[in-house]
Amino acid sequence: MKKWQFVGTTALGATLLLGACGGGNGGSGNSDLKGEAKGDGSSTVAPIVEKLNEKWAQDHSDAKISAGQAGTGAGFQKFIAGDIDFADASRPIKDEEKQKLQDKNIKYKEFKIAQDGVTVAVNKENDFVDELDKQQLKAIYSGKAKTWKDVNSKWPDKKINAVSPNSSHGTYDFFENEVMNKEDIKAEKNADTNAIVSSVTKNKEGIGYFGYNFYVQNKDKLKEVKIKDENGKATEPTKKTIQDNSYALSRPLFIYVNEKALKDNKVMSEFIKFVLEDKGKAAEEGGYVAAPEKTYKSQLDDLKAFIDKNQKSDDKKSDDKKSEDKK
């Protein structure tokens, strides 16, 4: 029997701690591995970590992984402050975040754990919006297109109700870079992705964007919009188009890990090893898309090399100390 325990709640999100009562296969699992690794960040990545946690806890009842959902930006703030061991992110780390980590002498490793497609959706009753290009999306979310007729002269002269994640989310940053060219998003903003979905389902003129799995979970209530690429080809988000990047709003999902935690916290290093060995299966089970298998293999090889290198360094320091003591 598994038990989810909420260990903290804020306006930005909740932290989940997964424990297990008894091993998943009737055994106690790896009883030698004890401790905790703490993370926070993307609400898009959090469900993948939770799914991985379920599998992990079956054999690691005393090794806890906590995963918050404060948003990518907020997660990086905690990562920079040294409050957490890992940060979940739905976008690559920004240059200014890298600089802040460097200023604090914090080194990190980046792991790509899955792929996603930011999905644009409208109300189920919308019978005219089937596809959009990035310029049309930009017009909608910059506020320049106030009605559907402003987007396409053949569409109704009805006010658009555009909703967006707020700036604490990596999805917001991704959309800002890929669609808005860093022009301000002028739309109703919400920290809760489920609230964005709800807004679109309740408003006939609604439009919103979020991670692919949120669309999959609510596809009976939403209508996805195909996105045109630079050649004008309209493509819908599917596991195939997201993985091969033919969908115009495809993106990788990450876990960033403090190198010190990888070296000093066996729970952290073993969990990341477990994540990579899973090869995206947990992501697929949660409605996301696995990265190509070679991505997991190369990262796993790099992780093992990093751990081995540091183990040899620690062994050498231990041997040197013993030699000094003998003198």
From Swiss-Prot:
Region spans: Disordered: 307-327
Taxonomy, superkingdom: Bacteria
PROSITE patterns per the UniProt record, alphabetical: PROKAR_LIPOPROTEIN (PS51257)
Record-linked CDD domains: PBP2_phosphate_like_2
Keywords for the protein's UniProt record, in alphabetical order: Cell membrane, Lipoprotein, Membrane, Palmitate, Phosphate transport, Signal, Transport
Alphabetized InterPro entries for the sequence: PBP_domain (IPR024370), Phos-bd (IPR011862), Phosphate_ABC_transporter (IPR050811)
Protein's cellular compartments: Cell membrane
Membrane topology type: Lipid-anchor
Entry's Gene Ontology BP terms: phosphate ion transport
A cellular component term, taken from the record's GO annotations: plasma membrane
Coiled coil region boundaries: none
Lipidation (N-palmitoyl cysteine): 21
Gene Ontology molecular-function annotations: phosphate ion binding
Primary location recorded for the protein, binned into one broad class: membrane
Leader sequence residues: 1-20
Lipid attachment points (S-diacylglycerol cysteine): 21
Complex formation: The complex is composed of two ATP-binding proteins (PstB), two transmembrane proteins (PstC and PstA) and a solute-binding protein (PstS).
Family to which the UniProt record says this protein belongs: Belongs to the PstS family.
Function: Part of the ABC transporter complex PstSACB involved in phosphate import.
Protein name: Phosphate-binding protein PstS
Source organism (scientific name): Staphylococcus aureus (strain MRSA252)
Recorded name of the encoding gene: pstS
